Amino acid sequence: MSAPRNKATLILALVLGGCDRTATEAAATGASMGRPLYTVSSGSQSTLLGRATFGDPSDRTFKVKRISGDWHAEVKATPNLDMAVQRIVFQPGGQSGWHRHPGPVFIQVVTGTMTFYESDDPTCAPVVRTAGQGYLDAGEHAHIARNESGAPAENIVVYLAPQAAALRIDAPDPGNCPF
């Protein structure tokens, strides 16, 4: 039994050694390892409050239309969609990492101040939202949320996504922002 374990350990050590050597060689020569495949969040804690599927399983098309005075809302989804609600608290200096969503996302800043940046904005202009304000992300493009203030910030986030789809898709740093 110990021989197979040793063989697996040896293979793992060779693979890890090869990775270390590549990174070391790149650092020594100044060569680039390329942009990371994604960026990670830091200084935040999220709690999924709930997720539910909306639609008729026999129809597989979800439709809602509401017109009242000057107000009009319409949602159509094929196939059915999920709605998820999440609470995210960002500590001072916390950030979401670059990411995107498969559908629209409604963000309400409950307490504190949040700053949002879009990957497709070459000027990296900040969009600042404070307690009581909202931010709409239409989905499908990368963005980052940052708490650039000195106090915690709490957000309630409502996601609309295809049924059973991931709510967040990590994205590489687009390189348009100085941070």
Question: Which residues are covered by each model-predicted region?
Answer:
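Secreted/periplasmic proteins that engage bacterial cell-wall peptidoglycan
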Residues: 66-72, 83-108
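Glycine- and acidic-residue-biased ligand/ion/polar-headgroup-sensing regions
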Residues: 101-122
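Bacterial N-terminal signal peptides
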Residues: 9-17
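A short, N-terminal "cap"/entry segment at the start of jelly-roll beta-barrel domains
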Residues: 19-82, 128, 171-179
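Short acidic-glycine-tyrosine-enriched beta hairpin
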Residues: 90, 121-140
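Ligand-binding loop in jelly-roll beta-barrel domains
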Residues: 129-130, 139-166
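Short beta-strand His + acidic residue motifs that chelate non-heme Fe in jelly-roll/DSBH
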Residues: 98, 116-117, 125, 137, ...
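Bacterial N-terminal signal peptides that target proteins for export
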Residues: 1-8
